[in-house]
Swiss-Prot record:
Bias (Basic and acidic residues): 435-460
Region described as Disordered: 435-483
Main localization category: cytoplasm
Annotated organism of origin: Mycoplasma mobile (strain ATCC 43663 / 163K / NCTC 11711)
SUPFAM superfamilies referenced in this protein's UniProt entry, alphabetically: FKBP-like, Triger factor/SurA peptide-binding domain-like, Trigger factor ribosome-binding domain
PROSITE patterns (alphabetical): FKBP_PPIASE
Keyword Chaperone among UniProt keywords: yes
Keyword Cell inner membrane: no
Pfam families reported for this sequence: FKBP_C, Trigger_C, Trigger_N
Localisation per UniProt entry: Cytoplasm
Name of the protein in its database record: Trigger factor
GO cellular component: cytoplasm
Free-text note regarding domains: Consists of 3 domains; the N-terminus binds the ribosome, the middle domain has PPIase activity, while the C-terminus has intrinsic chaperone activity on its own.
GO biological process: cell division; protein folding; protein transport
Amino acid sequence: MTKTEINKKDWEINVVVSSEKKLWKAKQDLALSNLAKTLKIKGFRPGKASVEAAKKHLNPEQIQEEAVKLIANDLVKIASESIDESYIVLDSPIYEVEKMSDAELDLKFSYPIYPEFKIKNYKSLKVTLSRAKVSKEDVDSEIEKIREKNALLIKKTKDQGKVAKTDTVNIDYVGKIDGEEFDGGKASSHELVIGSKSFIDNFEDQLIGFKSGDKVEVKVSFPDDYHSSKFAGKKAIFDVKINDVFTKEKPVKNDDLVKFLNNPKLKTLAEMENYFKDLIKNEKDEKSKASFKKDIFEKIMNENEIPVPRLILMKETTNAIREFEKDVKKYGFTVEKYLKMLNMNSKDFVTNLNKESELKLKEALIYTEISKLEKIEAQPEDYDVKYKKFAKLYNVSLDSVKSMITQQQAQVAIVNEKILEFLIKHNAIEKNSVGEEPKLSTTKKVVEPTEEKTRKDSKMSTKKPAAKPAAKPAAATKKPVKK
């Protein structure tokens, strides 16, 4: 027997299933048998206790709790079959015990469903979109990074020259405070880049003008906010010997520079410059697009009520917490230690993650609704354009792109990009980065977001929902017990 209730506050379907008495009894017997194998009872070998003996060492609640786990998959099938197909089920259900005794069991299964809502205002919202230009300086800066990265260190002889900015020096040094050496103040053959600011105060500047073989007395002061209070604000004197001086020899800015990019499609410096121009343009437009997207979605949310299913939000927040735990663990922290460093309590931490998760889900719902309202879908030719773009951008083969990005992943990105184009066309006030007056957008052109970023922005597919629920869940998750 089942009893179904639609909860439009939390957007879930609650189905209470009453188990057949015979099935419930059989599952309790099986649970007792399974538990008996885990017990160590005097007079029996481990795991070999009789059911009768085991029953004396277990309370009824233990047996019933184990039996619920065994029967849940049987009852969830009954619950799923009772759901009206007009509702779109978004995920597998969670379950909790409604009523339980030796003779009977009622389980309640809760399914998150797609909410019913309408976005009424998502046009003419007047949101600024900055159109950045790529300058010659931008391109030159990228070329210079390539030259810096591939520069050779050439040793200067004593007669060739003095220490200058950007030179690398090999030094021995001994530091003293009040005439006494201190921990960490001594090193041999240490390599230091002049101008890197890796040493305190103006230590590096005081070496400028000297040559290899010179001995220099360097006077510095530790900053008042130095991480070790033992040294904070103290004056120190370093006896420094300059062993060697190296200067950078950058590769010449010509066609030969292209080889350092390891891109067989680029042959000349001009091609390399155009490559960086396209890359920088894409990056700048990505930032502009991200800013526009943030502002337009914020306005749409302010203009419309976007309901988020409770269970989906709960799952999204739980996943976010797990991801955060994994991230801090990589750096040797626990969540507790990390939050202590931030002076944040766990309650505020979870609240913040919950808000972020809710925002992401609302964005996904907005994407989905606009795609339905405006009939925005991915066309077969869109996939070819998407794959070719990534192949060109990342200098990989078309087959490699197709193996990395599935058609479903590409579909979400394509539809979301089309929606963003639509929103720009109907809402953007374009502003040139050099300060031109804003003007209403008259073009559909928009820089495409990256695949990974778009997938993160939209956890729900923007494909038009089917007229019936998602595949019937085969398993249910037990609702966490409140402590």
